[in-house]
């Protein structure tokens, strides 16, 4: 698995934020479930984090105010960590929302270890782009080597390039109105955090609220649920992601989520937003330049997902 001598022990520290890394109350319309009675019941069953037995960081992006005086619609846009641990009760509960689409940002190695049973057992479109996490993190490490400090800024910058195909897939699904939709990675905080930040910005949510939403992952994650009881020692014989997680987790408390801020308390997502602003001016300009969206697409997104 080693890409070059000594590489894995070095770059595995960079994988922290990508892999594994209180209730923000809001009002909004009743969620878009297929049955109106079910929708009304479900709308009162949570504020932002969904009450799942085997879920981690599965939450609603709705309710944030937008710059035109609107509010992101509730019950349509969700984000989550790995969903392998969802119980039958969880799946029945989620089916009440009428989910149409799952966009899985994880790698082939991660999905092999932690499959999404709900996607297989429910009538939901499951969208993903196959790639190797080992190769992605090697590229992220090359960027982080050039950064000061812990290298997280470089890693987050590299995410915009690394998951560009997935970002295109996500925004295409949104523009097609394939919601309720949930986007996820392993922890639901880094790849999902960047993806969600871009969406919220495109809908006119302030940077303050975007960062606020990003930081909620520290409280909402359940790392032991995400771990899924997998024997990493055995899995590491054939799975590069398992080997990486063994190295990263050595000597650490597996029940604690990794922090999402620098030693100085600056959220990692801030570097990404700063980089986008510096290079493109706005997130919308980035979406147009890099993901191929048009001005009319941005208007469509607001029409679909903002009250």
List each model region and its residues.
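Residues at the beta-strand->loop junction immediately N-terminal to the Walker
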Residues: 184
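Non-Sec secretion/translocation targeting segments of pathogen effectors
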Residues: 1, 18, 32-34
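Intrinsic disorder/low-complexity detector
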Residues: 6, 25-27, 36
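Cys-dependent protein tyrosine phosphatase-like superfamily
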Residues: 30-181, 195-307
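Ser/Thr-glycine-rich phosphate-binding loops at phosphate-binding pockets of nucleotides
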Residues: 187-192
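Bacterial N-terminal signal peptides that target proteins for export
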Residues: 1-15
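Bacterial N-terminal signal peptides
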Residues: 11-25
């Amino acid at each position: 698995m080693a890409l070059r001598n000594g590489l894995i022990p070095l770059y595995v520290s960079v994988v922290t934020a990508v892999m594994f890394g209180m209730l923000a109350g809001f009002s909004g319309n009743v969620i878009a479930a297929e049955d109106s009675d079910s929708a009304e019941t479900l709308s009162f069953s949570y504020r932002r984090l969904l009450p799942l037995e085997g879920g981690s960081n599965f939450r609603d992006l709705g309710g944030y105010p937008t710059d035109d005086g609107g509010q992101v619609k509730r019950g349509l846009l969700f984000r989550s960590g790995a969903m392998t641990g969802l119980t039958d009760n969880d799946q029945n509960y989620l089916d009440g929302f009428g989910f149409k689409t799952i966009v899985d940002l994880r790698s082939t190695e991660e999905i092999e270890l932690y499959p999404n049973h709900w996607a297989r057992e429910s009538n939901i479109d499951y969208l993903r782009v196959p790639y190797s996490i080992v190769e992605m993190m090697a590229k992220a490490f090359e960027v982080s080597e050039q950064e000061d400090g812990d290298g997280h800024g470089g890693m987050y910058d590299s995410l915009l390039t690394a998951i560009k195909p997935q970002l295109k897939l996500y925004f295409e699904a949104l523009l097609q109105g394939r919601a309720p939709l949930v986007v996820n990675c392993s922890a639901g905080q880094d790849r999902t955090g960047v993806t969600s930040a871009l969406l919220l910005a495109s809908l006119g949510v302030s940077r303050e609220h975007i960062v606020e939403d990003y930081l909620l992952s520290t409280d909402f994650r359940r790392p032991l649920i995400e771990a899924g009881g997998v024997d990493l020692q055995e899995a590491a014989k054939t799975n590069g992601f398992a080997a990486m997680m063994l190295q990263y987790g050595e000597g650490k408390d597996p029940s604690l989520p990794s922090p999402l801020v620098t030693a100085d308390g600056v959220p990692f997502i801030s570097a990404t937003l700063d980089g986008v602003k510096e290079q493109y001016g706005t997130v919308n300009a980035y979406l147009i330049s890099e993901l191929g969206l048009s001005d009319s697409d941005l208007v469509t997104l607001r029409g679909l997902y903002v009250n």
